[in-house]
Amino acid sequence: MTIYLKIILFLFLICFKLQAFENPKVKINNFYIQKYEVTISEFSNFANKTNFKTEAEKQGFGYEYGAGWEKRKNWNYKTPYGKNPESLTEPAVHVSYFEAEQYCKFINGRLPSFAEWSTAAYTQVLDSKVFEKNKTYTYPSGDKAEKMNSTDLLSYKKHYDVLKLPEGINGLVAMGGNVWEWTKDRKDNSALTAGSSWWYSSSNTTKNGAQFKPADFYAIYVGFRCAFEK
């Protein structure tokens, strides 16, 4: 196979993955929530169809925490660490609250409220062979913090492909760890994020670990998932 055919095949596979991945909806009481964090594949599909540019793309940098918040050149949802990702089903990061809101609207959804997000993450509302129905747990993984992409549990030391992480409460994936997730709850110019990220320990994945961040903020640690009425 020539180098040109390999390039064509690679581009075809990328296009196929952009179109092929569908994020399942899980019914939680009177609303639905996506099983996975919104992926690079999904966000790219939205951006391609709407000619959408994130602020990280416009500014030419994303943020990582070092000696304070440090700019990282060419870090955006397409190249989260400044280079092509290992997988297009990694979470879409470097996305602000407002940009996440626009994506969810595009797919006829919205950001979940913190109350909705918390119910989905900690209370087992569906029949399950693993978790007790109607019980509210401490962690998105159950009574104990385990198998979540947090700095003290898994050795990835970065966000990870959502299809390779285990299911937790209600069959949802990465409600604890991996990346913080925007919710629609607001306070002045800030919005509430939940679930913590891989950079933190698992203790931050509890309900009390939620944090407000500036709504126009974007960084390597922050992504989202959408909720739906039906």
Cite the ranges covered by each PLM segment:
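Short, compositionally biased
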Residues: 2-80, 97-98, 123-127, 218-230
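Functional-site microenvironments in short loops/helix caps that host divalent-cation chemistry
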Residues: 53, 64-65, 71-211, 220
